[in-house]
């Protein structure tokens, strides 16, 4: 019997990676169809190899993508399908608005250097990837009746891709794309300051493109400060380690900075040490602006309810707090004002 959801009301999710939210069945299907070897040939085995039950280091977690990304990348049908199925997955979880993020380059096999996942040159460019994801998301919106927008990721280790990400954000602005992100390994020394990233984020500011940055997940508060002061981020992806710098944390509290919190993810990636109190408890107690998110549900074998159950059972979160954080998520979403207002009105109505 399925357990009762911890929060059985409409939810908003702002931090989830498309390439970390693929159905194992779909990976198997395209592995067979494209003749690409996978480490397992049943859904159950594949879920256990790709999935995690206990904490791994961040590199150990990132290695999981190597198993299945070659099966999806460079395949038009697969790229569109994972976007469509993502919307179905979120609709089933009771999400009414979600922002999903991905790197166009990591799903391409043409006009991308270096070539990801040891693929041979094909004909799917980063621009094609965005177009295909948009098609899948928009068809999913029609079929499942929820609203979905997308965020394009720059990668910390590939600053040479970032200006193209900016151009794609401009080209597809409001055609599902609402913002830019910086993802990848934040422990790469000085990566927030790589000229490619800085220039892309400056361009985003100039062009009115919204901005979020992964920072303070496993990195120091300094990475969060760089994200805010240099990259001019409007939201912080994770941000747990911000609380180690009281002055910075208090400043961001005053500025109403939004933290995209992923509790179950932070346990499995080792971003949070379970012997300590989770930063989200501090955020709750300080009435900070934050949301709850899945991050990579395929790898964490989770749904959004996993994160709600964890905070409810282990951290004493209440229904009132769940309402508050979802309203904050809607307020901090990258929707245009009119659509944001509609979303908020819906939440207020359903939360009464």
Curated annotation (Swiss-Prot):
In-chain residues carrying the UniProt-annotated modification N-acetylalanine: 2
Subunit structure of this chain's protein: Interacts with DPP4 (via extracellular domain). Interacts with PLG (via Kringle 4 domain); the interaction stimulates PLG activation when in complex with DPP4.
Species of provenance: Mus musculus (Mouse)
Binding locations of Zn(2+): 15, 17, 214, 295
Residues with site note (Important for interaction with adenosine receptors and increasing their affinity for agonists): 58, 62
Alphabetical UniProt keywords: Acetylation, Cell adhesion, Cell junction, Cell membrane, Cytoplasm, Cytoplasmic vesicle, Hydrolase, Lysosome, Membrane, Metal-binding, Nucleotide metabolism, Zinc
Domain of life: Eukaryota
Effect of mutating residue 238 to A: Increases affinity for adenosine 20-fold. Reduces enzyme activity 500-fold
Name of the protein described by the UniProt record: Adenosine deaminase
Coarse class of the protein's main subcellular location: membrane
Localization annotation: Cell membrane; Cell junction; Cytoplasmic vesicle lumen; Cytoplasm
Similarity section: Belongs to the metallo-dependent hydrolases superfamily. Adenosine and AMP deaminases family.
Cofactor remark from the record: Binds 1 zinc ion per subunit.
Catalytic residues identified in the record: 217
Binding site for substrate: 17, 19, 184, 296
Tissue note: Detected in brain neurons in the median emninence (at protein level). Expressed in secondary deciduum (at protein level). Found in all tissues, occurs in large amounts in T-lymphocytes and, at the time of weaning, in gastrointestinal tissues.
Entry-linked Pfam families: A_deaminase
Membrane topology: Peripheral membrane protein
Cited function: Catalyzes the hydrolytic deamination of adenosine and 2-deoxyadenosine. Plays an important role in purine metabolism and in adenosine homeostasis. Modulates signaling by extracellular adenosine, and so contributes indirectly to cellular signaling events. Acts as a positive regulator of T-cell coactivation, by binding DPP4. Its interaction with DPP4 regulates lymphocyte-epithelial cell adhesion. Enhances dendritic cell immunogenicity by affecting dendritic cell costimulatory molecule expression and cytokines and chemokines secretion. Enhances CD4+ T-cell differentiation and proliferation.
Listed InterPro entries: A/AMP_deam_AS, A_deaminase, A_deaminase_dom, Ado/ade_deaminase, Metal_Hydrolase
Effect of residue 296 to N: Reduces affinity for adenosine 10-fold. Reduces enzyme activity 100-fold
GO CC terms of this entry: anchoring junction; cytoplasm; cytoplasmic vesicle lumen; cytosol; external side of plasma membrane; lysosome
Cofactor(s) the record lists: Zn(2+)
Effect on the protein upon substituting residue 217 to G: Reduces catalytic activity 3200-fold. No effect on affinity for adenosine
EC nos: 3.5.4.4
A GO molecular function held by the record: 2'-deoxyadenosine deaminase activity
């Amino acid at each position: 019997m399925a357990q009762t959801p911890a929060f059985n009301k409409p939810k908003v999710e702002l931090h989830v990676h498309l390439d970390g939210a693929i159905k194992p069945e779909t990976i198997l299907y395209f592995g067979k169809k494209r003749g690409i070897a996978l480490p397992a040939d049943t859904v159950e085995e594949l879920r256990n190899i790709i999935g995690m039950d206990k904490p791994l280091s961040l590199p150990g977690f990132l290695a999981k993508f190597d198993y299945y990304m070659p099966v999806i990348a460079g395949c038009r049908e697969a790229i569109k399908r994972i976007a469509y199925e993502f919307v179905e997955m979120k609709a089933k979880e009771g999400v009414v608005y979600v922002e999903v993020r991905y790197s166009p380059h990591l799903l391409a096999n043409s006009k991308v250097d270096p070539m990801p996942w040891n693929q041979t040159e094909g004909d799917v460019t980063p621009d094609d990837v965005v177009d295909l994801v948009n098609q899948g998301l928009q068809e999913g919106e029609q079929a499942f009746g929820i609203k979905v927008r997308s965020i394009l990721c720059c990668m910390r280790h590939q600053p040479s891709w970032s200006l193209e990400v900016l151009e794609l954000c401009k080209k597809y602005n409001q055609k599902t794309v609402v913002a830019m992100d910086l993802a990848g390994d934040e422990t790469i020394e000085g990566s927030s300051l790589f000229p490619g990233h800085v220039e892309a984020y400056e361009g985003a500011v100039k062009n009115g493109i919204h901005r979020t940055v992964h920072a303070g997940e496993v990195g120091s508060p300094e990475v969060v400060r760089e994200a805010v002061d240099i990259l001019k981020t409007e939201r912080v992806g994770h941000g747990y380690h911000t609380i180690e710098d009281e002055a910075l944390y208090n400043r961001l509290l005053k500025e109403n900075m939004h933290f995209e919190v992923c509790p179950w993810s932070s346990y499995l990636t080792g971003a949070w040490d379970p012997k300590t109190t989770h930063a989200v408890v501090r955020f709750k107690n300080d009435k900070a602006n934050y949301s709850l998110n899945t991050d990579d549900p395929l790898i964490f074998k989770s749904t959004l309810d996993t994160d709600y159950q964890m905070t409810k059972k282990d951290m004493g979160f209440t229904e009132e707090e769940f309402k508050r954080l979802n309203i904050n998520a809607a307020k901090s979403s990258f929707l245009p004002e009119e659509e944001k207002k509609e979303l908020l009105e819906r939440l207020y109505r359903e939360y009464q």
